[in-house]
Amino acid sequence: YIGSIRVYESIRGRLSELYDYEYVSMPYRRGERYFFHMNKGLQEHSVFSMADSLGGEITVLVDPNTFEDERRSFAGSSITDDGTLMAWFTSSSGSDWKTVHFTNLETGEVLSDTLFWLKSGVAWNGDNSGVFYTMYDLPEEGEEYTQENRNQKILFHRLGTPQEQDSLVYHRPDMPDWMLYAGMMDDGRHLAIYIYDASVAACNGVFFVDMESADRQVVELLGDFDAAYYLLEAVSGVFYFMTDLDAPRYRVVAVDPSSPSRENWVEIIPESNQLLQWASILGGGSTILAGYTWEGYDSVLRFDLEGNMLGEVELPGRGSVWGFGGELSDTETFFTFSSFLNPGTVYRYSLETDESTLLWQPEIDADLSAYTETMVYYESFDGTRIPMFMLYPEDIELNGSNPVLLVGYGGFGVSNRASFRTSIIPWLEMGGIYALPCIRGGGEYGREWHMAGIRENRPTVFRDFIAAAEFLIDSGYTSPDKMAISGASNGGTLVAAVLNMRPDLFRAAAPTTGVMDMLRFHKFTVGWAWKSEFGDPDDPDDIEFLLGYSPYHNVLEGVEYPSVMISTADHDDRVVPGHSYKYGARLQAAQAGDSPILLRITSRAGHGGSIGLSEALDHAAERYAFYWQELGMEESP
């Protein structure tokens, strides 16, 4: 199919031109060393590196381009606070399963220690003698990519010993659906244990272990599972949390573990009219940096530890920021600033001077001044006002004939933000409009926005997305014959569900790695953890609303469906590929029209990662060629 589309090669070539630029990630500091990723331009994978100073001599730590197996990928790292030891992860064929390796950064020696079958990170203990990590029950041979992953436990691995001797730190066999995460506070004393219960949406518990106590007992600090709690840091024995308890847009509170009842909590930063998205405690505990967002655009405020506002961090413009993290003692931090038309630019921020310094700015081969970035608002079916990002060529005419790519996600409290995406540029150069609505189910307005799109409220997400399409048509941007829709993972589910509901509203659709069978998603790998978001297929009360939108079950014979390109990967062990296989087969069998129903399967790849840049650009070019063909477009990049 793709080979017959004449613009594929030109799109693919243009993508290569756009990605051929030197890339340097936002660095972070551990001890006296700085760590970052680099890419010279068109390297298949970025290279993880370090330097003793900013701008100093670079030492390559992990270069995935040298791995013998091209489907083995670098999957992250964890560096000790003093910058002397590194745990680093590899994954095979894009699987969520990780193998952990260890390197002495003083000598460059790769240690003999290796940890297998992890789906989590690791947390170094206070004296760097070992790491805490979580493990599920080991999968049966032959079922590594499909078997349910349950019964998580926290273990401790001491360097120099085999994994079989790792000691058990915490396990609740009576709670097989608890998901556990371990993190060591910067004080080197308190091990935090985060607990997520699959039956409770957007809530978690926080327990801790005082590693200096004689018995090292697990203390249930916050165990009601009634809100979200993010532990920022322990300062002088007091725990600072960001929480949405009694504050849907989040606040910061201080909890003394010796008297943790709520009447003893101290509110440090109250809830505001904007969404508090993150907070960091730096400067030896003197400063809280708090990141706020509202309708996709960010601001950063400074507070002292008592909650007195010290000022606002000056940002380069209107856009989004990532970063501002670090260790408690740090007096410098780093951030990346980006917007849809402003490529990610890296800055160093000094807490001592309250000034930002430009470190790195990419050079993209495109005239971004030829395009407009804006936010529009539309009414959904129930009168709710929904914001939507839009990107389009400056010379656009509202004549109803513009090609539109409408992209959605709408789930798990994930917020759409104004960030640069290089891969969008060819679409704009082809005369296309890019639209990204902030539909319910996401986190753009906090807890209530998320809760409005879960479980029995899931149809609200789909109707918000349909309302976005209708707005674009009614406003003269486009028409049904010129509209394509796209989404990945939860967004793939959205696209497939909307396609069933309104096949007349779109000309093309590209659902990627979506959950398509809502009655069986919980039977594979970590699918059971999504029951709080989707509903429980084993609960008779939930089956009715799950069946009401399940993409696989709502494909109808005799319907003229638009053109569809379904994408999945054969080693996806998060959303197993069977979802896309069976949905695609059913859609092909039911199609009453002439439009193609295509299934694109990536070999030896997972839900994300593993494939190199060239293959990722192949996939992007295929999708744009598909849209170009099915929407009857004329321009090519």
Language-model-derived ranges and their functions:
Residues 1-78, 89, 178-210, 215-234, ...:
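Non-catalytic accessory segments flanking enzyme active sites
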